[in-house]
């Protein structure tokens, strides 16, 4: 596992503290994202996309987002024994510094795959996969010590139910971890209120406005926020381009922060990036308004990139954005001045040391791919990214990865290239 270039919690760490900042569990998908489509293809027709990107998806969206912000992240997930599984494992562990000690490789089980097609700032998806051969609770066993865990609440498997796939979060909570929770879309339309009964064990709940209003049976995001705040110490409701609002009963704070104005290209994973930013702010003990502002800025940076999980910003991206905002404040009107005042706290946070550029999604599954670099022969080690000041970092959007830039050669790696210590578990027979 590579070493993170910047640690925003360095001053908070003690020798006896938890090994990890965040522990996660879930399903990792291989995401293939097509961009620049003029329209969805009609039946019996074929169209060409202007660009494409391949990257780990699912719970990997959140793992990469937290790790890129400098949070020491551990992930428990099942990985297939196919090339897609190799790619996702390698990307998470070697490229994104995510600990996979609680993850497992399973023989004869293929990786779940999602194909996402972006049209007019919206997206449609097709997914295929099978349940993991082993429940998360069995794969994890005793979770590692962490400052926080992030879970998705489910009406079918509540946090405190014995045998639930989420009971690992309860074990982590007993060992001192704060539980940050979100919730998924309910395709049944039932939106059972029993989900909210699980909030008594959570530190924070971070649904979007649609989900919050549906579960609380309210008509406005603010009414939903107040209803949630009666059940959990920290209530957060995100509202897309409108911003986010929150109540922290542990500090007595209430805040609303508008989102920065950006041209959104791909909303994939924006909620995960927001959550990662909010968790960092909470662990750093920032004021509530700063937590919301930082999380909103991270999400705004992510939606300007194609490529799912690898669109998540790193500290170099945040530093570059803040420097641009600060320099433009004097000649960009009231909005620019307001933005600079709102984010002035970043002056004490952005790295003062060089940090490496984060990587964006490449078009195809490639073993050697780097920002501004070229693939190395299979007999030589991959060139490490050059460390440079944040303002000089380059990125490679997914739309450039298939056509506008020289194509990366496909992997020619042999089985000897794989880590022999990677745990592999035989699949359970049906």
Task: Map each language-model feature to its residues.
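Short pre-catalytic strand/loop immediately N-terminal to key active-site residues, enriched for Gly-Thr
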Residues: 46-55, 257-269, 288-290
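Short, small-residue alpha-helix embedded
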Residues: 63-65, 71, 213-214, 265-292, ...
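Ribokinase/PfkB-type carbohydrate-kinase core domain
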Residues: 1-30, 89-105, 117-256, 286, ...
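Short arginine-rich
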Residues: 301-310
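Substrate-binding N-lobe of the ribokinase-like
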Residues: 5, 9, 22, 42-113, ...
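Short, flexible, mixed-charge acidic loops at enzyme active sites
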Residues: 34-42
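A structural motif shared across PLP-dependent enzymes of the aminotransferase-like
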Residues: 31-35, 55-56
């Amino acid at each position: 596992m590579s070493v993170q270039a910047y640690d925003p919690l360095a001053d908070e760490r003690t020798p006896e503290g938890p090994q990890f900042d965040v522990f996660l569990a879930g399903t990792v998908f291989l995401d293939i994202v097509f961009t620049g489509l003029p329209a969805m293809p009609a039946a019996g027709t074929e169209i060409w996309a202007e660009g494409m990107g391949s990257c780990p998806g699912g719970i990997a969206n959140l793992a990469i987002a937290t790790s890129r912000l400098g949070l020491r992240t551990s992930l428990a997930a099942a990985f297939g024994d196919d090339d897609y599984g190799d790619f996702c494992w390698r990307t998470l562990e070697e490229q994104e510094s995510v600990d996979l000690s609680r993850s497992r490789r399973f023989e004869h089980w293929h990786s779940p795959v999602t194909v996402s097609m972006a049209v007019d700032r919206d997206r449609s998806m097709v997914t295929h996969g099978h349940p993991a051969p082993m429940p998360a609770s069995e794969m994890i066993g005793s979770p590692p010590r962490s400052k926080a865990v992030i879970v998705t609440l489910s009406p079918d498997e509540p946090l405190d139910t014995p045998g639930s796939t989420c009971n690992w979060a309860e074990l982590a909570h007993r060992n001192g971890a704060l539980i940050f929770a979100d919730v998924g879309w309910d395709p049944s339309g039932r939106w059972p209120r029993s989900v909210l009964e699980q909030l008594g064990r959570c530190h924070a709940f971070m649904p979007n406005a649609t989900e919050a209003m549906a579960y609380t049976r309210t008509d406005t995001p603010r009414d939903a926020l107040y209803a949630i705040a009666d059940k959990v110490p920290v209530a957060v409701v995100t509202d897309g381009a409108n911003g986010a609002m929150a109540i922290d009963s542990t500090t007595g704070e209430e805040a609303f922060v508008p989102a920065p104005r950006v041209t959104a290209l791909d909303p994939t994973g924006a909620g995960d990036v927001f959550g990662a930013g909010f968790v960092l702010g909470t662990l750093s003990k920032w004021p509530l308004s700063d937590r919301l502002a930082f999380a909103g800025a991270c999400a705004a940076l992510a939606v300007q990139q194609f490529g799912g999980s690898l669109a998540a910003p790193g500290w170099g991206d945040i530093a570059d954005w803040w420097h641009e905002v600060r320099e433009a404040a004097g000649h960009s009107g009231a909005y620019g001045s307001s933005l600079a005042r709102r984010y002035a706290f970043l002056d004490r946070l952005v790295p003062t040391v060089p940090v490496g550029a984060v990587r964006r999604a490449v078009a195809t599954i490639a073993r050697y791919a780097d920002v501004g670099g070229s693939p190395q022969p299979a007999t030589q080690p991959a060139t490490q990214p050059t460390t440079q000041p944040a303002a000089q970092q380059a990125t490679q959007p997914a739309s450039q990865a298939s056509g506008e830039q020289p194509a990366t050669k496909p992997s020619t790696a042999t089985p000897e290239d794989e880590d022999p210590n990677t745990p592999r578990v035989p699949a359970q027979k049906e």
